[in-house]
């Protein structure tokens, strides 16, 4: 793709992300994406062969941003496993306090595509969640947690549950409750 086409491609990806996030993948048309980026539909299809391919590229871009943010978060955490857990759930509560917060876009997308198990976007979402969980395992291992992969899976399960319940109930206290449960889990694993 020509170098001058990159800004157009980035604009398309940014607009598609916003529209998919606000309204859901199935409720957004390629016409709307073209209109939002002020390009013709032909230009849109020159960059992305299909809406499915566009979604895959949007998710890849969001995956990279989210992983970078999570790594930055992890780099700021030092000390005890409890500090890691408390930081994770504190940041989840802060994230959930954003205006018009709607939970994890990756999770919402998988729910939207539940009847399409082979859809490429689902594979990207699976990989995204697995990479975040693996990074948490690395943080826990560096903090001296035994069986860090297993503990990370359990804590990740609590974080996903907290995200879902904060979205359903609009109550950020679920993050603190999940942090308490995760810390109990870590303490009990030391006995």
Residue ranges and their predicted role:
Residues 1-23, 27-39, 52-56:
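Basic, helix-initiating cap at the start of DNA-binding domains
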Residues 5, 13, 59, 63, ...:
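Amphipathic, non-transmembrane alpha-helical scaffold segments
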Residues 12-20, 92, 136, 159:
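Short hydrophobic clusters on alpha-helical segments that form packing/core surfaces
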Residues 38-48:
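Short hydrophobic/aromatic patch on the recognition helix
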Residues 55-62, 69:
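Alpha-helical DNA-contacting segments of helix-turn-helix folds
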Residues 57, 71-102, 152-155:
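Hydrophobic alpha-helical connector segments
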Residues 96-119:
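Amphipathic alpha-helical segments used for helix-helix packing
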Residues 118-127, 141-185, 189:
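Hydrophobic/aromatic-rich alpha-helical bundle segments in the mid-to-C-terminal region
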């Amino acid at each position: 793709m020509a170098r001058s086409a990159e800004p157009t491609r980035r604009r398309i990806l940014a607009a598609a992300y916003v529209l998919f996030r606000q309204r859901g993948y199935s409720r957004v048309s390629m016409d709307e994406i073209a209109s939002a980026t002020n390009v013709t539909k032909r230009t849109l299809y020159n960059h992305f062969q299909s809406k499915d391919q566009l979604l895959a590229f949007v998710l890849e871009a969001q995956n990279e941003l989210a992983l970078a943010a999570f790594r930055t978060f992890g780099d700021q955490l030092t000390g005890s496993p409890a500090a890691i857990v408390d930081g994770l759930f504190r940041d989840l509560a802060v994230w959930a306090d954003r205006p018009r917060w709607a939970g994890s876009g990756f999770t919402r997308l998988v729910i939207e595509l539940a009847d399409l198990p082979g859809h490429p976007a689902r594979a990207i979402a699976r990989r995204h969640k697995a990479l975040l969980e693996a990074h948490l395992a690395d943080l826990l291992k560096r903090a001296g947690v035994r069986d860090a992969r297993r503990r990370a899976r359990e804590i990740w399960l609590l974080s996903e549950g907290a995200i879902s319940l904060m979205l359903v109930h609009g109550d950020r206290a679920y993050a603190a409750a999940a942090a308490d449960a995760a810390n109990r889990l870590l303490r009990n694993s030391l006995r």
